């Protein structure tokens, strides 16, 4: 919050006054991260209509979907601070009484729809695959945050290949 306030030329209190709550500021930061993540993936996939992807109406090849996810993990590997912030908030929000609980429920549901949509044209069970992809991403990121020497991208590529093979897919 302090860094964001400084970048905006405001005090912490001034920033929170304009946004509403500390959680609101954090959600704004995470929403901006999501927008950047979509842009990273779109830079690989071309002109992506994310609403069509989310609805399962896009026709992405397995190769394109895997390349987009690889680019996302590669991008995340360059920003441990925001990945750490996200992981901490996501885990704190497991408690139903946490002010961000509903936010993370909605965000996970949205992410699962995006991932399922990316594989809708190729996977026999895209919703199952999307849940495994999300679990893999979150789990590997947490391991990488604890053990920075872990090659996040290489480990991701290998594990995703194994998951895809379990769904009868290959790149």
Question: How would you name each of these model-derived features?
Answer:
Residues 1-28:
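Helix-turn-helix
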Residues 4, 29-33, 37, 115:
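Generic hydrophobic, amphipathic alpha-helix propensity
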Residues 19, 88-96:
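Short helix-capping/turn signature of helix-turn-helix
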Residues 23, 33-34, 138-142:
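Conserved acidic functional residues
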Residues 28, 41-82, 129-133:
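Hydrophobic alpha-helical connector segments
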Residues 38-39, 62-67, 78-82, 97-121, ...:
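Amphipathic alpha-helical packing segments from all-alpha helical-bundle domains
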Residues 97-106, 120-171:
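Hydrophobic/aromatic-rich alpha-helical bundle segments in the mid-to-C-terminal region
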